Amino acid sequence: MVNSNEEDERRILDVEESLLTQEEVNNHLTGLSSTAEDGSIDIYGNPPSKKKTGNWKACPFILGNECCERLAYYGIAKNLITYYTSELHESNVSAASDVMIWQGTCYITPLIGAVIADSYWGRYWTIASFSAIYFIGMALLTLSASLPVLKPAACAGVAAALCSPATTVQYAVFFTGLYLIALGTGGIKPCVSSFGADQFDDTDPRERVRKASFFNWFYFSINIGSFISSTLLVWVQENVGWGLGFLIPTVFMGVSIASFFIGTPLYRFQKPGGSPITRVCQVLVAAYRKLKLNLPEDISFLYETREKNSMIAGSRKIQHTDGYKFLDKAAVISEYESKSGAFSNPWKLCTVTQVEEVKTLIRMFPIWASGIVYSVLYSQISTLFVQQGRSMNRIIRSFEIPPASFGVFDTLIVLISIPIYDRFLVPFVRRFTGIPKGLTDLQRMGIGLFLSVLSIAAAAIVETVRLQLAQDFVAMSIFWQIPQYILMGIAEVFFFIGRVEFFYDESPDAMRSVCSALALLNTAVGSYLSSLILTLVAYFTALGGKDGWVPDDLNKGHLDYFFWLLVSLGLVNIPVYALICVKHTKKKAL
């Protein structure tokens, strides 16, 4: 007989939660708690009430913060290559390289923010502090684009090589603002998605399901900001002026900060667990010191605390896994330690959970590395896709379409695809796979990898046809670029969201900011690698006085060859990724 309280609870389970197994529902109903049990605290340092904090009631402020911050970021990034060529008078190759390096830096600095968040400040204060740095960088960049003394003289209708270059002082002001933004975003990127996911209690099956949906809507909010940047801001920058075009995203960055602080009373906070780098080093040192000791046949003899939670603040225990057994020696209790009870030195003896943290990082690395190729392909959206579009017919009656604004098709398809994926595709696929999320994170990422290759292949085909038409002095319509943007947009929905969720779910509790930063570092390495490949290809194909594959005048080059090179790289990567996925072992929290 089910009592009235249980009946009330069952009514609460909506369509979103129908993917829970009956066992999970029953366990939840019998062990219902009014406070979160994942180690989080509220603003007063107490266990947070499920009714008053977190969950979807806190998420609008986090999603609003992310939407406005991404609008600010993409308000700079989407058309930055045009600013380099038209305002700073750089060549196509130099401008593309500079943009890729800056974008790469924006995805490396999250390592700084992540370590600070997980070790010392926590995610909330890291986001707050780095947002201030971000805003200062935006303001400085706006001044650089607004004051005539801080930018080169206008040079319309002349090749970039013949224009006056920016002075050292002008570059100094511009790059200071640009790289302050890169530093500021380093404290936000690795923390905000994890901070949003922290609002859902991982020990509550209903909230765990909602957390999976949160990642979809988190990426949806990112693309709302991107959509506005790709349309309104790009048009303002190219038709009204760069000063106003940079001022608008600066204002939205201020709105982003305000949105974040307003939601403070509703947030759940995870305590920082200490330096993850130190814990990794402790495991390696302890394992080395006990290299000659034998592992016990019964793993229950490995050292672990008897408490419910681990010794690491804000972290649950992790179940022991096979593999990398040499690391298990860090948790072997020596004869001396057993007799003396000297268990307090983590440089000599580590818990199983601490050892499993290191194993988890090692297992993540192959997945991380195989995603670099996707980042190489994706980086073309803001660089060579834009330059390709600039060489096409962009006139509709009297209106000239800014080529960077075509990124709106990528954004639109993301905005359309996420609700379809979350509300229709997941329930449909779940019928066949039996997986609550429809697809595993790794399957989702694999589909994204394949679609990104198709996108670059579409760009290569368009470029081949465009070059043939250019020989007859016929300009191909820029609207032929739409398929490549659409394919890359669908690839984003699968790969990017899958990657964010994979690195959050698989990461140890006290390393979630760091692991989110590692996912972003993947994008950084991809941007740098893309820049390196482009520079090398441009150099070697231009030897002997040739124009090369990527000259300033693309009609004299072979950008299609470069795109096919990237397609080949992507096709080689897909089977490698599949093999890595087959061998991957998932983390299991206790």
Swiss-Prot record:
Membrane topology, as annotated: Multi-pass membrane protein
Annotated keywords: Membrane, Phosphoprotein, Transmembrane, Transmembrane helix, Transport
Entry keyword Transmembrane: yes
In-chain residues carrying the UniProt-annotated modification Phosphothreonine: T126
GO function term, MF aspect, one: transmembrane transporter activity
Matching InterPro entries: MFS_trans_sf, POT_fam, PTR2_symporter_CS
Residues spanning the membrane: 96-116, 130-150, 168-188, 214-234, 242-262, 365-385, 401-421, 445-465, 478-498, 524-544, 562-582
Identification of the protein by name: Protein NRT1/ PTR FAMILY 8.5
Biological source species: Arabidopsis thaliana (Mouse-ear cress)
